[in-house]
Amino acid sequence: MPEKGRAGEAAAASFLEEKGMKIMERNFRSPRTVRGGEVDIIALDGETLVFAEVKTWSTREIDALEQSIDNKKQRKIIETAKYFLSLNRKYIYMAIRFDVIFISPEGITHLASAFTERV
């Protein structure tokens, strides 16, 4: 992973912790056989399990950033979240949320509930 991406994920994790969330996993991967991918951050926000995708960009063109999380990427994140839940059954009855965190030189933009499983 490029240094910019690592730094962005570290900033996003710190940001979520400052908001009172507990970071449970970073860079969680599912096997290729599951058709998933990677979830950058898995966190607890009270009684809600949050799966967060972090995007680090050198500009703050929010439209381009939002388009970077297309339906295919959303499906991969959802499949990876399902795989995480299959391994961690104690969380299967919790509320689930999919967030996107954009990191740019201007700051952090956190989109809670950026997409849902209906993708």
Question: Which residues fall in each region the model found?
Answer:
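Active-site metal-binding core of divalent-cation-utilizing nuclease and nuclease-like domains
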Residues: 22-49
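Anionic group-transfer/hydrolysis microenvironments
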Residues: 27, 40-42, 55-57, 101, ...
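Catalytic cores of nucleic-acid endonucleases
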Residues: 31, 56-106
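Short, low-complexity, polybasic intrinsically disordered segments
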Residues: 103-119
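Protein kinase-like catalytic core scaffold
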Residues: 48-50, 99, 109
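Acidic-basic catalytic patches of nuclease active cores, encompassing PD-(D/E)XK
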Residues: 1-28
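Conserved catalytic cores of phosphodiester-cleaving nucleases, focusing on short active-site segments
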Residues: 39-60, 77
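Short, conserved glycine- and acidic-residue-centered signature motifs
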Residues: 1, 5, 9, 35, ...
